[in-house]
């Protein structure tokens, strides 16, 4: 005979968690808004304004993620109760096992929704940019920056964030000096915002004929793409705009043209670059959008008492602002903020970062 009480307890627990989320996410208001948005999108007039239609489509997807999950939980738990009753009546172990599997599936759906609670920041739902900058250390540090670039590109691809390499600057011998990736998708910034900081590598350098261990640093800075309705005043006289020939590592990512743009905001010494289009005009527009996003995030950081260190992390590549240590010889990667670590170093370098990201988000970093 199978154990019924644990299953009944889990059904009750999931129902209570669902009810709690119903209040936290303001289900009734979201459901009402979803109906309004759906009606508007079904109107032919909305397509006269493609930007408005796109924004509504994005809002509908966000609303559906909450409303549909809660609806599915309600109906799913009701179905599971029916299955359990049937299993008990007929003493059918196969039906009971099916009940347990369905409960596990519903719990995973609920856990996903609970995880979304951590994306409560005003910009968390936005697309984002991720800057990578190699630290001092020459070729070894530049190779490490390239490994970090590959790691985040793999992570973005695995999560459907359509990573786009906006700019990459080759290293002197190997690797890269710096790069910028754009991640497009719901909660891209929410997922990546705690990755800002310094990433430290310890390994036997392939560039050292003596095979000595080297320590290298690479900084990461994440900032959200901002909506057009947020006004950022930039004085044109504060900008220095340079054009150059794109020469990115791994030419499959970047067009090798004369149209690359570098914009420097002189008062803050903030630099953005774009070289992913053959059109200089399009690259300039993309770089200006990126500059506004970066200046906006820097201003937000300044307004928070504990954010000065995060701003410093953009340029201070050293011991003080480390967030994660990658010790390859010992097969150990450890997050210095949460204590989470793994020995599967290759999986992490191939983009398996969720264990670290989820722990940092859950700890409220």
UniProtKB/Swiss-Prot annotation:
Tell me the SUPFAM superfamilies matching this sequence. Answer: Release factor
Gene3D superfamilies according to UniProt: 3.30.160.20, 3.30.70.1660, Release factor
* Residues where N5-methylglutamine is found: 252
Record's SMART domains? PCRF
| Keyword annotations from UniProtKB, A to Z | Cytoplasm, Methylation, Protein biosynthesis
Molecular function GO labels: translation release factor activity, codon specific
Q: Which PROSITE patterns match?
A: RF_PROK_I
| Locations listed in the record | Cytoplasm
Question: GO cellular component annotations, sorted alphabetically?
Answer: cytoplasm
Transmembrane domains' residue ranges: none
Q: Give the protein's function.
A: Peptide chain release factor 2 directs the termination of translation in response to the peptide chain termination codons UGA and UAA.
Specify the protein name: Peptide chain release factor 2
Q: Which organism is it from?
A: Shewanella baltica (strain OS223)
Which gene underlies this protein? Answer: prfB
């Amino acid at each position: 005979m199978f154990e019924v009480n644990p299953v009944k307890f889990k059904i009750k627990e999931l129902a209570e968690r669902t009810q709690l989320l119903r209040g936290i996410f303001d289900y009734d208001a979201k459901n009402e808004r979803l109906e309004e948005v759906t009606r508007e999108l079904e109107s032919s007039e909305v397509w006269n304004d493609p930007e408005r239609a796109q924004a509504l489509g994005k809002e509908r997807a966000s609303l559906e993620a909450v409303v549909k999950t809660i609806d599915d939980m309600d109906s799913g738990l009701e179905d599971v109760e029916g299955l359990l009753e049937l299993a008990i009546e007929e003493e059918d172990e196969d039906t009971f096992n099916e009940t347990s599997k369905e409960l596990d599936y519903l719990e995973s759906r609920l856990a996903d929704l609970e995880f979304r609670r951590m994306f409560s920041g005003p910009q968390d739902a936005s697309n984002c940019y991720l800057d990578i900058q190699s630290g001092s250390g020459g070729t070894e540090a530049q190779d490490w920056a390239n490994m970090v670039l590959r790691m985040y590109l793999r992570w973005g691809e695995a999560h459907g964030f359509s990573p786009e390499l906006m700019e990459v600057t080759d290293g002197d011998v190997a690797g890269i000096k710096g790069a910028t990736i754009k991640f497009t998708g719901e909660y891209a910034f929410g997922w990546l915002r705690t990755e800002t900081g310094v990433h430290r590598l310890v390994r036997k350098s392939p560039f050292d004929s003596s095979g000595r261990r080297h320590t290298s640093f690479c900084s990461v800075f994440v900032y959200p793409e901002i909506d057009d309705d947020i006004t950022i005043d930039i004085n044109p006289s504060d900008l220095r705009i340079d054009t150059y020939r794109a020469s990115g590592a791994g030419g499959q990512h970047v067009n090798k043209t004369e149209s690359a743009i570098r914009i420097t905001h002189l008062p803050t010494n903030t630099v953005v670059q774009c070289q992913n289009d053959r059109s200089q005009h399009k690259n300039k527009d993309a770089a200006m959008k990126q500059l506004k996003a970066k200046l906006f995030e820097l201003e937000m950081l300044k307004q928070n008492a504990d954010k000065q260190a995060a701003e410093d992390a953009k340029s201070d590549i050293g011991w003080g602002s480390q967030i994660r240590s990658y010790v390859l010889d010992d097969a150990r990667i450890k997050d210095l903020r949460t204590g989470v670590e793994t020995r599967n170093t290759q999986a992490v370098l191939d983009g398996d970062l969720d264990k670290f990201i989820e722990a940092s988000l859950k700890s409220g970093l």
